């Protein structure tokens, strides 16, 4: 739940102020999506001695933030992440208030009720 609240808080920031994307530590090492970065003298850096640390630069939070809010007609929406083996358990999201945007706790997709 804390991740959803953090995600919502980040989405309210102006695009220039968001901290999305690959960041680099003071030592020049890329920081992963989990914030993993090692000190210069950390023994765990031995696995990157003769090779570069590979970090996927397409963080999921960046990709979800680019998705537009889905406008739906119903008051309650069911999200299953696309269904099948690639989806997630079905969750139901209430969209009762006019200004409310419902966010799926699994995949981060946002839904808003289209009022006539």
Curated annotation (Swiss-Prot):
What does the entry give for GO biological process? Answer: aerobic respiration; cellular senescence; circulatory system development; DNA damage response, signal transduction by p53 class mediator; fatty acid metabolic process; gene expression; kidney development; mesenchymal stem cell differentiation
Q: What happens when the gene is disrupted?
A: Male and female mice are fertile but produce smaller litters and pups have a lower neonatal survival rate. While mice are normal during the first 4 months of life, they are prone to rapid onset weight loss and sudden death after this period. They display cardiomyopathy associated with a doubling of heart weight, impaired systolic function and a reduction in functional capacity. Males are most severely affected, with a propensity to develop cardiac failure and diminished survival after 4 months of age. Defects are due to membrane respiratory chain NADH dehydrogenase (Complex I) deficiency.
Q: Which GO terms describe its cellular component?
A: mitochondrial inner membrane; mitochondrion; respiratory chain complex I
Query: Transit peptide extent?
Result: 1-20
Subcellular location per the Swiss-Prot or TrEMBL entry: Mitochondrion inner membrane
Q: How would you describe this protein's topology in the membrane?
A: Peripheral membrane protein
Q: Does the keyword 4Fe-4S apply?
A: no
- One Pfam entry name: zf-CHCC
Which InterPro entries does the UniProt entry name for this protein? NDUFS6, Znf_CHCC
For this protein, the record's Gene3D superfamilies field holds:
q5lls5 like domains
Chief localization: mitochondrion
Indicate yes or no for the key word ATP-binding: no
What keywords are assigned to this protein? Acetylation, Electron transport, Membrane, Mitochondrion, Mitochondrion inner membrane, Respiratory chain, Transit peptide, Transport
| N6-acetyllysine modification, residue list | 90, 112
What domain of life does the native source organism fall in?
Answer: Eukaryota
The record's similarity note reads: Belongs to the complex I NDUFS6 subunit family.
Subunit (UniProt)? Mammalian complex I is composed of 45 different subunits. This is a component of the iron-sulfur (IP) fragment of the enzyme.
Function statement: Accessory subunit of the mitochondrial membrane respiratory chain NADH dehydrogenase (Complex I), that is believed not to be involved in catalysis. Complex I functions in the transfer of electrons from NADH to the respiratory chain. The immediate electron acceptor for the enzyme is believed to be ubiquinone.
Q: What is this protein called?
A: NADH dehydrogenase [ubiquinone] iron-sulfur protein 6, mitochondrial
Instruction: Look up and give the organism this protein is from.
Output: Mus musculus (Mouse)
């Amino acid at each position: 739940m804390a991740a959803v609240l953090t995600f919502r808080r980040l989405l309210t920031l102006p695009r220039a102020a968001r901290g999305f994307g690959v960041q680099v530590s003071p030592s020049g090492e890329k920081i992963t999506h989990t914030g993993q970065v090692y000190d210069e003298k950390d023994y765990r850096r031995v696995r990157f001695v003769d090779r570069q640390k590979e970090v996927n630069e397409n963080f999921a939070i960046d990709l979800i933030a680019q998705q537009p809010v889905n406008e739906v007609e119903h008051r309650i929406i069911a999200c299953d992440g696309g269904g099948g083996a690639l989806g997630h358990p079905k969750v139901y999201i209430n969209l009762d208030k006019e200004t409310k945007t419902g966010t799926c706790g699994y995949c981060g997709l946002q839904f808003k009720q289209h009022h006539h």
